């Protein structure tokens, strides 16, 4: 036989039925070498007649979308496999992944197609030796080149066992529990994937007995099988076989060709692991199985292009199987573990595997077997790759990403005890014992790394897209519902449907910070030096905050001095200044900041007002204010009388730094800014000479440059009362800072994925109103103590800060005492 022969990586145990597994029993040898065992077989009981097939489930909605909770798929036949629950496969099914449209080549001993669990499955077969002579054996076990004879079958059914792990049809309807107790059948991990079962065992090898018992594979046969799979355009190749590493690179080169063709190649690591010991003669024997066998050992080499993986086995307690070859150093980053001990799959009829056994059932259907070996770990990984490629079409263009996802999301395998095969400890991270760890589909089907939305022409993080804007727009992004169901991408560019409400709730609290004024700055101004002079109709006042003496920072800039100047003339007044702001009739809350365009500008801003009396006792004010990034210009008309005053105005304002005190356009790749035209009405009433009532309201039409918005209107209002009390005056203010009351934004958003994995975008319209309404309450008492000493005590409460419903209330208190110097 040309080339070193490879063997099946398996030992199997028969089960009585799919519902009643054999608790104890002897091993039935299926393949020679690679850890196969020999002995008598336990015969299955006659299974109950199969139930009528359930009605097909309704077609799932287009992916990505959750069609049911994972628990809905954890049916009897799911759990009967033993392996699927160990890797969390139900998480893949929950979002509609089935393997549909993915073709997996199983290079093995062939597969039957009429097993009860293959009815409806897409399984095609090909035999590389059916019409072309292959290296093989005659009836005496001597080497011969021949085509396969019709009676040359693998009575162990190794290829059928492997195929069942991948593609056994799901019978349970996840939408109902009616059939969950049906006592027959299992399901494959990728139960809607198609399988190309390529038979490549050497003709006559499966019929050998004695020391050479079991199916064997010549390198040349395997090469032909791989080349055939490449020619057929399969997506994944599963090779549940292997042997000793030799110097002939023919087989390895064929695997590399498959990888270069864009095919993912999944190979059993081997079943040769044996700890060091002594032989029958008492001689010391070194441990074996420290590395994957041939051809799995090439996983991880550069020529494999990240598309070849070696698969080891774990038992039902998630411990590495004694027989499983370890990862070794060269392949450890491409060595993954999956269930391979005590799992249940489809097999040949017991009359073929155990002919003449009186306990065999009377039918000629296939049966179910409990099996062990890395032969069955590999198809779990092959099926998992099919699920990923089905669910995330973008991975088809870069199939190595699908494999990388499984490697990156594997559960790290840590065992503090030195491994009996390698003598090393399976520590944190990839290691020579367990490679990257145990496959975890629940994690593999979760978004990984940075998660982004392709909005308009920009790609922004979910946190940035859904973060509350603050200012007038609050939490519009999550409140609008427009982001629900959009498609976001993870670091592998996979698409997922967005649950915007849940994502927004998971964002860190306090992203917008506190709106309480800076108490240090307020204290500095309370302790400021103030001067004022007046000469005739001209007055001038200035205020300089105190300098903080900090020995750790002795060279501080001098504080900015604010000033106010006024000149009165017949019928009018001119007033200008820096800092503070234009006086208003409407009351304001002093202990909370109103970001953006408020009543006043920062201490660095300048302002001016011209007042002129017109007819009917009315006064017209023209005013303007500027700061580095904000400007305000307007006109108002009002009247000041003894007991009452009012003012109506219109103003134009712009802010080049924020969207009305928040951040909105930035998530669309534009600069936060705003322009608005505001209409205001404010008044003051002093009905009894002592009680003063004042209020103000504003409605504004808003434009947000850089984005497509329509009909944005905001509101803002305040009411207050002041009354003398003892040696001072008590004031109470209730105010709502500027809030968006109407308006929409239209933007291009990712709404779907096509069958090539390309993001599909369409226009989405979202409301800009926030979920809550911030109301601020403030009480102030300003009083005289004695002489020139004065005091102030204030307390304020803000409910639904930043107009976000359910956000925690904020409160603050202030007390100051001062005197003239």
Located regions from the model:
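Transmembrane beta-strands of outer-membrane beta-barrel pores
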Residues: 546, 578-584, 622-628, 650-656, ...
């Amino acid at each position: 036989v040309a080339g070193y022969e490879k063997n099946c990586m398996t030992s199997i145990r028969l089960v009585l039925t799919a519902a009643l597994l054999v608790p104890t029993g002897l091993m039935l040898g299926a393949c020679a070498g690679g850890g196969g065992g020999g002995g008598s077989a336990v015969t299955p009981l006659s299974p109950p007649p199969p139930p009528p097939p359930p009605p097909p489930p309704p077609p799932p909605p287009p992916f990505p979308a959750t069609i049911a909770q994972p628990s809905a798929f954890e049916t009897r036949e799911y759990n009967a496999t033993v392996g699927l629950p160990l890797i969390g496969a139900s998480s893949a099914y929950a979002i509609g992944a089935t393997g549909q449209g993915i073709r997996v080549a199983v290079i093995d001993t062939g597969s039957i197609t009429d097993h009860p669990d293959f009815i409806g499955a897409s399984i095609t077969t090909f035999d590389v030796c059916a019409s072309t002579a292959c290296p093989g054996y005659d009836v005496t076990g001597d080497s011969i080149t021949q085509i396969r004879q019709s009676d040359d079958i693998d009575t162990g059914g190794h290829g059928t066992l492997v195929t069942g792990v991948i593609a056994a049809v799901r019978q349970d309807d996840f939408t109902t529990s009616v059939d969950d107790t049906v006592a027959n059948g299992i399901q494959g991990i990728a139960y809607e994937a198609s399988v190309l079962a390529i038979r490549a065992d050497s003709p006559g090898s499966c019929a050998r007995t004695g020391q050479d018992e079991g199916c064997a594979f010549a390198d040349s046969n395997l090469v032909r099988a791989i080349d055939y799979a490449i020619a057929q355009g399969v997506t994944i190749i599963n090779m549940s076989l292997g042997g000793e590493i030799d110097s002939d690179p023919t087989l390895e080169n064929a695997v590399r060709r498959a990888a270069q063709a864009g095919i993912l190649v999944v190979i059993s690591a081997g079943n040769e692991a044996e700890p060091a010991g002594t032989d029958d003669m008492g001689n010391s024997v070194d441990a074996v199985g420290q590395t994957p066998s041939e051809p799995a050992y090439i996983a991880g080499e550069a020529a494999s292009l990240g598309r070849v993986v070696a698969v080891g086995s774990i038992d039902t307690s998630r411990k590495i199987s004694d027989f499983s070859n370890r990862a070794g150093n060269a392949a450890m980053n491409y060595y993954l573990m999956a269930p391979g001990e005590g799992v249940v799959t489809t097999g040949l009829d017991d009359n073929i595997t155990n002919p003449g056994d009186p306990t065999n059932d009377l039918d000629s259907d296939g049966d179910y077997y409990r099996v062990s070996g890395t032969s069955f770990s590999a198809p779990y990984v092959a099926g998992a790759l099919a699920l990923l490629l089905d669910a995330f079409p973008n991975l088809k263009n870069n199939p190595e990403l699908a494999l990388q996802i499984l490697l990156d999301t594997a559960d790290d395998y840590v065992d503090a005890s030195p491994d009996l095969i390698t003598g090393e400890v399976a520590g944190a991270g990839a290691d020579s014992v367990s490679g990257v760890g145990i496959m975890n589909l629940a994690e593999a089907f979760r978004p990984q790394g940075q998660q982004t939305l392709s909005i308009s022409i920009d790609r922004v993080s979910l946190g940035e897209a859904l973060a509350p804007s603050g200012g007038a727009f609050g939490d519009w992004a999550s409140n609008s519902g427009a982001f629900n169901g959009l498609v976001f991408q993870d670091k592998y560019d996979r698409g997922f449907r967005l649950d915007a409400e849940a994502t927004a709730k998971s964002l860190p609290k306090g992203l917008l910070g506190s709106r309480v004024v800076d108490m240090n700055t307020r204290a500095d101004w309370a302790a400021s030096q103030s001067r004022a002079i007046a000469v005739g109709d001209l007055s001038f006042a200035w205020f300089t905050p105190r300098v903080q003496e900090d020995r750790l920072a002795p060279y501080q800039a001098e504080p900015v001095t604010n000033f106010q100047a006024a000149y009165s003339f017949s019928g009018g007044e001119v007033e200008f200044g820096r800092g503070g702001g234009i006086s208003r009739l409407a009351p304001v809350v002093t202990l909370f900041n109103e970001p953006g365009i408020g009543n006043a500008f920062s201490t660095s801003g300048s302002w001016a007002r011209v007042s002129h009396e017109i007819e009917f006792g009315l006064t017209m004010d023209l005013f303007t204010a500027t700061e580095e990034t904000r400007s305000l210009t307007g006109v108002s008309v009002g009247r000041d009388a003894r007991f009452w005053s009012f003012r109506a105005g219109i103003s134009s304002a712009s802010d080049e730094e924020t969207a009305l005190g928040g951040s909105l356009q930035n998530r669309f790749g534009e600069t936060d800014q705003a322009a608005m035209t505001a209409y205001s009405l404010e008044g003051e009433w002093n009905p009894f000479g002592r009680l003063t009532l004042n209020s103000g309201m504003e409605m504004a039409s808003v434009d947000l440059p850089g984005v497509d918005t329509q009909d944005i209107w905001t509101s803002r209002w305040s009411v207050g009362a002041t009354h003398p009390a003892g040696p001072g005056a008590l004031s109470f203010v209730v105010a709502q800072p500027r809030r968006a009351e109407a308006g929409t934004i239209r933007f291009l958003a990712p709404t779907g994925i096509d069958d090539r994995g390309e993001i599909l975008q369409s226009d989405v319209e979202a409301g800009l109103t926030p979920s809550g309404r911030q109301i601020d309450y403030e009480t102030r008492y300003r009083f005289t103590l004695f002489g020139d000493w004065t005091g102030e005590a204030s307390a304020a409460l803000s409910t639904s800060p930043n107009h976000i419903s359910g956000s925690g209330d904020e409160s603050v208190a202030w007390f100051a005492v001062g005197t003239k110097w």
